[in-house]
Amino acid sequence: MSTTGPITNYYVDSLINHESGDVIAAARFSAPGSHPAGPRPTSLVPECGDYPSCSFAPKPPVFSSSWAPVHSQSSVVYHPYSHQPHLSTDSRYMRSWLEPISGAVPFHGYPGNGRHYGLKPDAFPDHRAGECLGTNGRTYTDYLYCSSTDMRDKTQQNAPSPESELLTSGKHKEEKPELDPNNPVANWIHARSTRKKRCPYTKYQTLELEKEFLFNMYLTRDRRYEVARVLNLTERQVKIWFQNRRMKMKKMNKEKGDSKDQ
């Protein structure tokens, strides 16, 4: 019976380990409010009935606190819990962003000897080319640290004067190239009409034509040629003028007849 001690220890340890594992698994996977399941019967109990009972102090559980229930998923593989090592407590790597700097920016309207809050040197950089501006050319920092009078002065300085606007508009007009009307490649919208400009008659020519019209409303070809030569006009111009004058006279006579009937 000298081998009873080691064999008993082996079987007792195996029984204790199985029971503790069942308790932990039941506490982990059981729903809240449900009764814990009893220990699972093992096949080793009947075989150990011949050995005397021994009392051993139970081993402390591996994990001090019970785990929260985990939703079981078929596609997730269970990994045993491993305690993460504590992070280094070196003070060089902690709260570096809260360290105050000597050149902290004071707020407008508060005394300069007050408490300075930790700010990075590039917290309020100067205006750069890619920085967004407001509608009136002021940045966000101008609203924070400038008074109303300073903002009004900056707005007046940034506002363009009417003289500068006139100069810029004149420059744009001068830079616009003029299209050559004789150039066939020019756009047809900007092309000028090929029709001859209207050449109004002078007062002397109009007076002489009116006198001739009073003597005779219709001119012969010889008389038309003579009038055109004297007035320095073409026969076609004299003919058109007489045609227009006859139409005008008919219109005037018609208006007079309508006014009399009324």
Curated annotation (Swiss-Prot):
CDD domains: homeodomain. GO terms for cellular component: nucleus. It holds the Pfam family Hox9_act. The keyword Iron does not apply. InterPro entries: Abd-B_homeobox_TF (IPR050803), HD (IPR001356), HD_metazoa (IPR020479), Homeobox_CS (IPR017970), Homeodomain-like_sf (IPR009057), Hox9_activation_N (IPR006711), HXA9/HXB9/HXC9 (IPR017112). Residues 194-253 bind DNA. Sequence-specific transcription factor which is part of a developmental regulatory system that provides cells with specific positional identities on the anterior-posterior axis. This is Homeobox protein Hox-C9. It comes from Oryzias latipes (Japanese rice fish). The gene is hoxc9.
